[in-house]
C-alpha cells in the first residue's frame, strides 16, 4: 500500500512534467507527498575565493546564515512554481505536499537518505536533468537511485517529450 511518496526534483526544464505525475499518483493513492531538491556542495574554487576575502568569523557566518537563506529561498521557489503550475484549481493538490526539503549534498545520496528518513513507500524521479544530452537515456542520479533504492521507483521518461518538441 502506498501511503507516502517522495518526489525528487532538479528544478529543471521538465520538473513540471514530473510534478504532474507525482501529484496524480498522490491523488490516486490518497498519499502524502514530500518534495526534495539536492543542492551540490560549493566547489573548492569558490570556497578558496571566499577564504581569501573573508576572515574566519565572516566565513563561518556566511556558511551558516548564507546557506540557510539560499535553502529557504529555493524551498519557496519550489512551492511558488507548484502554485504557478497548478493555478487556482490546484490548491487541493498543494495540500497533499507535507514538506519541501532542500538538502546540500550529492543528489543521489540526498534522495536515498530522504527516502529512508521519511519512510516513504514510493520514489518519483525524472530520467535525467536538463544538462544531460539526448544521447543519454538515463542520467547519473537516476541510475544510482534505481540501483540503490529500497522502495519502488516511479521513473518519468523525459526523452519522448524532447523528441516531440516539448508540446
Model-derived features: where do they sit?
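Short, flexible loop segments at boundaries between secondary-structure elements
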Residues: 151-162
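Structural beta-alpha unit
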Residues: 1, 80-123, 160-167
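General small-molecule cofactor/ligand-binding pocket signal
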Residues: 36, 99-103, 154
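A short acidic, glycine-rich active-site loop
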Residues: 56-76
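Short secondary-structure boundary segments
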Residues: 37, 127-128, 157-158
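Glycine-rich, Arg-bearing micro-motifs that act as flexible, cationic patches
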Residues: 122-147, 162-165
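Small/aliphatic-rich secondary-structure junction motif
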Residues: 1-63
Amino acid at each position: 500500500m502506498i501511503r507516502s511518496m517522495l518526489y525528487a526534483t532538479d528544478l529543471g526544464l521538465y520538473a513540471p512534467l514530473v510534478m504532474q505525475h507525482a501529484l496524480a499518483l498522490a491523488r490516486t493513492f490518497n498519499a502524502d507527498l514530500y518534495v526534495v531538491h539536492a543542492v551540490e556542495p560549493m566547489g573548492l574554487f569558490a570556497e578558496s575565493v571566499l577564504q581569501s576575502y573573508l576572515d574566519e568569523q565572516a566565513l563561518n557566518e556566511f556558511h551558516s546564515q548564507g546557506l540557510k537563506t539560499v535553502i529557504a529561498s529555493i524551498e519557496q521557489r519550489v512551492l511558488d512554481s507548484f502554485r504557478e503550475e497548478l493555478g487556482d484549481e490546484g490548491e487541493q493538490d498543494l495540500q497533499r505536499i507535507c514538506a519541501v526539503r532542500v538538502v546540500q549534498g550529492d543528489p543521489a545520496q540526498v534522495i536515498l537518505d530522504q527516502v529512508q528518513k521519511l519512510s516513504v513507500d514510493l520514489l518519483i524521479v525524472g530520467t535525467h536533468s536538463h544538462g544531460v544530452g539526448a544521447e543519454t537515456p538515463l542520467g547519473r542520479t537516476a541510475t544510482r537511485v534505481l540501483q540503490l533504492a529500497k522502495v519502488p521507483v516511479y521513473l518519468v521518461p523525459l526523452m519522448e517529450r524532447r523528441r516531440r518538441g516539448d508540446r
